[in-house]
């Protein structure tokens, strides 16, 4: 079913481009926006534009942060273990681990994984930035890299690639323990399972 209004269809199309949003959900979102006062629509539009204009990637870990808070609060936070870096695929994975309140080290966000079928190679994700952080002249001594990528074929491929790059540097490489279903995304795993996976990490 398509509406007679081109403006409504354009709004539905825009919502449907969001990850995990099908056309049925997109229609509901569009109808919800239309039923709200104009002020609410303006607030939504303003929030979207502000996020695009003001949010940047942390110059250290590549997680998202406000432009005026770079480096991010995790990289600069007191009490964080500077010797351990947990490598994740996306910012939502950082949020998942932070919700557990168990892990106290630092992070590095790749913003993707190696996927030859999609034309994504090592140079297309933040591997170079990770290796730069591991150089002695960068300051603090990193003793452990925790690979916490999603348990997919692409995630495993990326983990193997990283382990081979990092091992010659004399830094211990570990990966979170099994127990997370193959193909699952970390952002949807409950806090208890993630905590156990981090606590039970093993040498890669």
UniProtKB/Swiss-Prot annotation:
<protein>
    <recommendedName>
        <fullName>Recombination protein RecR</fullName>
    </recommendedName>
</protein>
<comment type="similarity">
    <text>Belongs to the RecR family.</text>
</comment>
<dbReference type="GO" id="GO:0008270">
    <property type="term" value="F:zinc ion binding"/>
</dbReference>
<feature type="domain" description="Toprim">
    <location>
        <begin position="83"/>
        <end position="181"/>
    </location>
</feature>
<feature type="zinc finger region" description="C4-type">
    <location>
        <begin position="58"/>
        <end position="75"/>
    </location>
</feature>
<keyword id="KW-0233">DNA recombination</keyword>
<dbReference type="InterPro" id="IPR034137">
    <property type="entry name" value="TOPRIM_RecR"/>
</dbReference>
<dbReference type="GO" id="GO:0003677">
    <property type="term" value="F:DNA binding"/>
</dbReference>
<dbReference type="GO" id="GO:0006310">
    <property type="term" value="P:DNA recombination"/>
</dbReference>
<dbReference type="Pfam" id="PF21175">
    <property type="entry name" value="RecR_C"/>
</dbReference>
<dbReference type="InterPro" id="IPR006171">
    <property type="entry name" value="TOPRIM_dom"/>
</dbReference>
<dbReference type="InterPro" id="IPR023627">
    <property type="entry name" value="Rcmb_RecR"/>
</dbReference>
<keyword id="KW-0234">DNA repair</keyword>
<dbReference type="Pfam" id="PF21176">
    <property type="entry name" value="RecR_HhH"/>
</dbReference>
<keyword id="KW-0479">Metal-binding</keyword>
<dbReference type="Pfam" id="PF13662">
    <property type="entry name" value="Toprim_4"/>
</dbReference>
<keyword id="KW-0862">Zinc</keyword>
<keyword id="KW-0227">DNA damage</keyword>
<comment type="function">
    <text>May play a role in DNA repair. It seems to be involved in an RecBC-independent recombinational process of DNA repair. It may act with RecF and RecO.</text>
</comment>
<dbReference type="InterPro" id="IPR000093">
    <property type="entry name" value="DNA_Rcmb_RecR"/>
</dbReference>
<dbReference type="GO" id="GO:0006281">
    <property type="term" value="P:DNA repair"/>
</dbReference>
<keyword id="KW-0863">Zinc-finger</keyword>
